[in-house]
Amino acid sequence: MPPARRVPRGSDRTSRSQSLRYTVDASVFVNAFNPHEDGHAASLAILTATQQGGDPVIVPTLLLPEIASAVTRASDDTAGALQYVSATAALSHLTLVSLTPVTARQAAELAAAHRLRGADAVYAAVARRYGTTLVSRDEEQRSRASAVVMCQTPEEALRSRQTPKRTRRSRTK
């Protein structure tokens, strides 16, 4: 697997990239994989929309083993799970962020301060560090992480992408 790509931080981001940058929890990727789960259509739709729009999705490398584990346990299909992991890792708009000692410490602080599960805190730390919206199917994660980052369900993320189009008024003298 290629090394994680570097993501620029700071004030040089454009307003478009600030409003359409996401950290997507494994719960959404797993839900999008299984057409029999409630919410599958919205999870698949937000992943498709970010890909088609080229919107940055910045996730911890932890995403990959989480997907492999959940898909294999639900389907007993190791090869299919690993194929999905490979396809996910290869997405051009997806950036994998390594769990460095600094990120791990930030996640630990979030876990302790907001009673987040360990993996949930890692996603929240990545979202906070890169100024992204955390998209998750996990109600507890969204509720607890919302103290530090913007959190949305896939349905909410889809709605927020739909901005009203402005029409030009003609000026008459």
Residue ranges and their predicted role:
Residues 2-21, 96-97, 124, 128-173:
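Acidic, PIN/NYN-like endoribonuclease modules and their adjacent C-terminal/linker elements
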Residues 2-59, 74-86, 159, 163, ...:
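Short, well-structured N-terminal submotif of metal-dependent ribonuclease cores
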Residues 24, 58-59, 98, 118, ...:
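Short beta-strand scaffold positions
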Residues 28, 63, 103, 122-123, ...:
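Alpha-helix capping/helix-boundary segments
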Residues 35, 61-62, 86-113:
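Acidic catalytic patch
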Residues 79, 95-97, 114-116, 139:
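Recognition helices and adjacent regulatory flanks at domain boundaries
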